[in-house]
């Protein structure tokens, strides 16, 4: 059984689809119990390399037992856009993760990246 119920899954999927259709950015959301002893940043980096991510692929990796997370976004996704990754991490994703609001964290990440070029 996953960490998202059917309604949460649908809400996250809608946000990810809207981001991809509108901006061409594919946000991969991964929920794992833990990062296997790795720092969240390193775990996400390894996943990106192993999965052959492109410049339009971002990742939100959440360790639900931690809780901990890593939000990795290539520069190509944010260049020319008013996107503050640190604010998205600190003010939107982190509070949701630490309240165990897994769907809210993913939706916040997708909405934070869904910004038109400035």
Each language-model region and where it sits:
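A structural boundary signal for the start of the first folded domain, especially the loop/turn
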Residues: 1-118
């Amino acid at each position: 059984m996953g960490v998202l119920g059917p309604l949460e899954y649908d809400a996250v999927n809608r946000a990810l689809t809207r981001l991809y259709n509108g901006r061409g950015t594919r946000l991969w959301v991964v929920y794992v119990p833990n990062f296997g002893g790795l720092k969240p940043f390193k775990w996400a980096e390894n996943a990106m390399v192993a999965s052959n991510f492109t410049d339009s692929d971002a990742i939100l990796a959440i360790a639900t037992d931690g809780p901990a997370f890593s939000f990795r976004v290539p520069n190509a996704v944010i260049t020319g856009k008013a996107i503050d990754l640190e604010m998205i991490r600190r003010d939107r994703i982190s509070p949701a993760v630490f309240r165990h609001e897994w769907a809210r964290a993913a939706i916040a990440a997708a909405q934070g990246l869904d910004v038109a070029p400035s």
